[in-house]
Amino acid sequence: MSKDTIANILTSIRNADMNKKRTVRIPYTNITENILKILLREGFIENMRKHQESNNLFFVLTLRHRRKRNRKGPDKTVLNLKRISRPGLRIYSNYQRIPRILGGMGIVILSTSRGIMTDREARLEGIGGEILCYIW
């Protein structure tokens, strides 16, 4: 595991989704908790619970499996997660230039002065911040 906790979250969820796993364990941090609450609220994950095992806190996520239909060949997952701002290259945006993912179908997760929030919430409040990731 690397020091980039957000990349670890996204990679764990992406790998579990690609391997058709129903649950995934993610180490607990405050940033992790805020991002997972957004994913739960937006419907990208089905359930989230906190679990403790010998002084180690972690989240157990239940993934929502949505598959593309009407395609020949194996099913592809619909969940896509992409890390944007990273420790070596921070990406910031004001509220007017926050990108729209798939015309508003996806979400952008931002870290603002008022906490971690989605692109829609940031536009409504009129604040920008660091673009953490895209999810569609």
From Swiss-Prot:
Location of the protein in the cell: Plastid, Chloroplast
Signal peptide region: none
SUPFAM superfamilies with a match to the protein in the record: Ribosomal protein S8
A family per Pfam: Ribosomal_S8
Record HAMAP family: Ribosomal_uS8_B
Known function: One of the primary rRNA binding proteins, it binds directly to 16S rRNA central domain where it helps coordinate assembly of the platform of the 30S subunit.
The protein, known as: Small ribosomal subunit protein uS8c
Organism, as annotated: Morus indica (Mulberry)
